[in-house]
């Protein structure tokens, strides 16, 4: 999910 604090940072 894309939130204000990035949830995707762990997914390089």
Curated annotation (Swiss-Prot):
Changes after translation: The complex may be glycosylated.
From the UniProt annotation, give the residues forming the signal peptide: none
- Gene Ontology cellular component annotations, sorted alphabetically: extracellular region; other organism cell membrane
The residue ranges of the C-type lectin domain are 11-12
What this chain does, per the record?
Potent platelet activator that aggregates platelets via both GPIb (GP1BA/GP1BB) and GPVI (GP6). Alboluxin induces a tyrosine phosphorylation profile in platelets that resembles those produced by collagen and convulxin, involving the time dependent tyrosine phosphorylation of Fc receptor gamma chain (FCGR1A), phospholipase Cgamma2 (PLCG2), LAT and p72SYK.
Q: What is its main location?
A: secreted
Please report the organism this UniProt entry assigns to the protein.
Trimeresurus albolabris
Which biological processes are named by the entry's GO terms?
A: venom-mediated platelet aggregation
Fill in the subunit field for this protein: Trimer of 3 heterodimers of alpha and beta subunits; disulfide-linked.
Single GO MF descriptor: toxin activity
This chain belongs to which protein, by name? Snaclec alboluxin subunit beta
Question: Where found?
Answer: Secreted
- Family, per entry: Belongs to the snaclec family.
Keywords of the record = Disulfide bond, Hemostasis impairing toxin, Platelet aggregation activating toxin, Secreted, Toxin
Further information in the entry reads:
May not activate platelet via the integrin alpha-2/beta-1, since antibodies against this integrin have no effect.
Q: Where is it expressed, tissue-wise?
A: Expressed by the venom gland.
